[in-house]
Swiss-Prot record:
Homology family: Belongs to the YbaB/EbfC family.
Annotated protein name in UniProt: Nucleoid-associated protein XCC1002
Annotated compartments: Cytoplasm, Nucleoid
A Gene Ontology cellular-component term: cytosol
Listed GO MF terms: DNA binding
Amino acid sequence: MRGNIAQLMQQAQKMQENLQRAQEELAKLEVTGSAGGGMVSVTLTGAKECRKVRIDPSILSDQEMAEDLIAAAFNDASNKIDAESKERMGSATAGMQLPPGMKLPF
């Protein structure tokens, strides 16, 4: 019985180390989302901080369209980060599922 507990503790510690490493890698990650066939692009970090916005000058005359495309590009980048985070955290937890509603990184 004690051997099982010790083994579980070792596995938990290794998983924690893997999670921390994955979080550090995600923080360095930069992802670009785009919209309007590339007329707008938004680059976010893994922490979802905006690093760059590129807007094709041809859409600036239509404010509503520009706003919609910026939002769509941001959402595209955000979704890519979520997918990458899920993949990396899944690898770090060895596929162990988290309870519903719990997201990583915490």
